[in-house]
Amino acid sequence: MKFAIVIEKDEDGYYVVKVPSLPGCHTQAKSLDELMERVKEAIELYLEVKKNVEDGEFIGVQVVEVKTG
């Protein structure tokens, strides 16, 4: 399987990756090589856990207002 990933570099110099099609699947590393290894592992673990967990019952979508400033 192939997955699109989004890579960013944070203010501490770490590379951070997320997998948009797998909510909550993300990792970080100091180098791009290490990041690619870690994201593959994160995806594998995500898929392994997902197949062993039943999907919850969809309840709905709500809008929440938060005041800032």
Swiss-Prot record:
InterPro entries referenced in this protein's UniProt entry, alphabetically: HicB-like, TA_system_antitoxin, TTHA1013/TTHA0281-like
Taxonomic superkingdom: Archaea
UniProt similarity note: Belongs to the UPF0150 family.
PANTHER family for this protein: ANTITOXIN HICB, UPF0150 PROTEIN SSL0259
Record-given protein name: UPF0150 protein AF_1072
